[in-house]
Amino acid sequence: MIYVDIRGVYPLLSNSSILEAFFFAVSELMPRKKNLDVTVSICSLRSDTTGYHIKTDRYTHEIELERNQNKEDFLTALFHEIVHVRQTERGVYCDESRPYYKRPTEIEAYKLQEELLKKWKYLQS
């Protein structure tokens, strides 16, 4: 079963809309995934950060998203962090010896976040 717990409030989207976007991304990125437990915390982060992801246990993840950003950036950050969920579920971890933007995990996450956002916006229109 896929469990999602949203903590906090994002003023520009309802929690049900955030859940809808979450499940859209999971179905696009991990269509056969059956076991997943994700906590999405909406909070204030460092000024240069829009989101974080950490795997805390098998199938268990935490995502933190900056609450003070526009709706498109918020969704983009959500999709970006869900790409990291997929990566760690597949056993792919970031190489912190490389500069941030040269890490294969970040290159993939930035590419897929844009593809997901484009498809999401199309489906919502």
Residue locations for each model-derived region?
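Catalytic zinc-binding patch centered on the HExxH motif and its immediate surroundings
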Residues: T39-E62, K71
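Hydrophobic or amphipathic, alpha-helical segments that drive membrane association/targeting
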Residues: M1-P11, K33-D48
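Zn2+-dependent metallopeptidase catalytic core
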Residues: L12-L36
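Post-HExxH zinc-binding segment in Zn-dependent metallohydrolases
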Residues: S97-S125
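Catalytic Zn2+-binding segment of zinc metalloproteases
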Residues: I82-E96
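Hydrophobic (often cysteine-bearing) scaffold residues that line and stabilize catalytic clefts
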Residues: S14, I18, L75, T105-E108
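Surface-exposed helix-capping loop/turn segments at secondary-structure junctions
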Residues: E28-N35, V92, W120-S125
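Short pre-active-site segment immediately N-terminal to the catalytic Zn-binding motif
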Residues: H61-L78, Y101
